[in-house]
A protein has these predicted regions:
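Generic structural signal for well-ordered, non-membrane alpha-helical segments
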Residues: 89, 104, 108, 112, ...
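Conserved PLP-enzyme active-site core in the AAT-like
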Residues: 7-10, 22-30, 41-58, 64-72, ...
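N-terminal "arm"/small-domain region of PLP-dependent enzymes with the aminotransferase-like
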Residues: 58, 62, 79-174
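A short, flexible N-terminal coil/short beta segment enriched in small residues
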Residues: 1-16, 163
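A short, Lys/Arg-enriched amphipathic alpha-helix followed by its capping loop at the start of a domain
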Residues: 15-23
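A short, charged/proline- and glycine-enriched loop
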Residues: 1-5, 33, 190, 213-214
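Conserved N-terminal alpha-helix of the aminotransferase class I/II PLP-enzyme fold
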Residues: 152-202
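Active-site beta3 strand of CheY-like receiver
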Residues: 35-39
Length: 343
């Protein structure tokens, strides 16, 4: 399935009418978020310096019409040069399509790319879901309204996990695994797992993997209720609660500074589990709500420096954030950018 258009300069539009089934638009008719290549001729070289084009890394293709024109100053920003004088239009458009297809493949994440290609193949479905790509809904006025509201592709892409071409979601292989590996790379994680039912279920997966009855959990009062369910109810861990600030308007702030003091934490542990109070790492797991509902964002580096040596694990619940590493002023808040030593 082809998602991107091709932007043509005014002079090129008179020479090229279509490219391998892709929509062609003028360079001044797009914001370049839907474009897979910009095609200009050697008389339009000023467009090479367009910041919108360069910011997305969109390929620039130059059609050579005048061999005497010097384009050396622009070569480092040009993806491909096509000698139109010595090529047919069909060969030219084939070269353009190769460039667009490569760019499209580079920007689409693995699973979405595979899913859209699979949908584009228009395979017949003999498994679930039973609406058959949305066609079943067309048998009733209510269903037709439902179908028309969401549009065709959402139903055609509603596929059974038995469609093995897309990979197995349960044993992590194929395109499903490729997507997880891609997400890990993007987020600077060692591994990434996709979990259904949102962060509530993801939290329970982590907590049930790490905690057993009697383990000490250092518990942020701002934690989501799924932390209570997974850590306290299901796993049976013993909580050490950390106090949080609260203003006269009821807004909940961050954990109070003294709660990160080692002697204070060991004192609280002694009250619940005296035999663990003097252990090197008395805390099995600390759970910190990295970004709170009220807008408090913790600096992960500071948290780890304060209590990391007391804990086997620190779990940052990032349900309200997660994008801090991509925002320069918030990078220091990201747990996934930390350089960690043996302690």
């Amino acid at each position: 399935m082809k998602h991107l258009k091709v932007a043509l300069s005014d002079s090129v539009q008179s020479k090229i009418k279509s490219i391998a089934g892709r929509t062609c638009v003028g360079v001044f008719e797009t914001d370049f978020t839907d474009v897979g290549a910009v095609v200009i001729d050697d008389g339009d070289l000023d467009l090479v310096n367009n910041n919108q084009i360069s910011s997305f890394g969109i390929p620039i293709i130059v059609l050579r019409l005048d061999a005497s024109r010097d384009i050396s100053l622009y070569e480092n920003r040009i993806t491909s040069i096509i000698e139109l004088l010595s090529m047919s239009i069909d060969d030219c458009t084939s070269e353009i399509e190769k460039v667009v297809a490569n760019y499209e493949a580079s920007i689409l994440p693995p699973f979405f790319r595979a899913l859209s290609d699979y949908v584009g193949d228009e395979n017949s479905q003999f498994d679930c879901p039973g609406h058959q790509g949305g066609q079943f809904f067309y048998k009733h006025p209510t269903g037709r309204a439902f179908y028309n509201f969401f549009g065709e592709n959402i139903f055609r892409a509603d596929l059974c996990n038995a469609d093995v071409k897309l990979g197995d979601l349960l044993i992590h292989e194929g395109y499903a695994y490729d997507a997880q590996a891609h997400a890990a790379k993007v987020y600077n994680a060692d591994k990434t797992y996709f979990v259904l039912n949102g962060t509530s279920s993801a939290n329970k997966v982590v907590l049930n993997a790490l905690l057993t009855p009697g383990d000490i959990i250092l518990y942020d009062r701002n934690n989501h209720k799924s932390i209570c369910h997974g850590g306290l109810v299901m796993s049976g861990a013993t909580p050490i609660y950390l106090e949080t600030a609260r203003n006269p308007f009821g807004s909940i702030g961050g954990i109070l500074d003294h709660c990160f003091d080692e002697s204070y934490i060991r004192q609280l542990v002694a009250e619940k589990s005296p035999e663990k109070a003097n252990a090197k790492r008395p805390i099995r797991l600390a759970v910190i709500q990295l970004g709170t509902y009220d807008g408090t964002i913790y600096n992960a580096r500071q948290v780890v420096d304060k209590i990391g040596h007391l804990c086997d694990y620190i779990f940052f619940d990032s349900a309200w954030v997660g994008y801090e590493q991509f925002i320069p002023m918030m990078k220091d808040c990201s747990p996934l950018l930390l350089e960690l030593g043996p302690n």
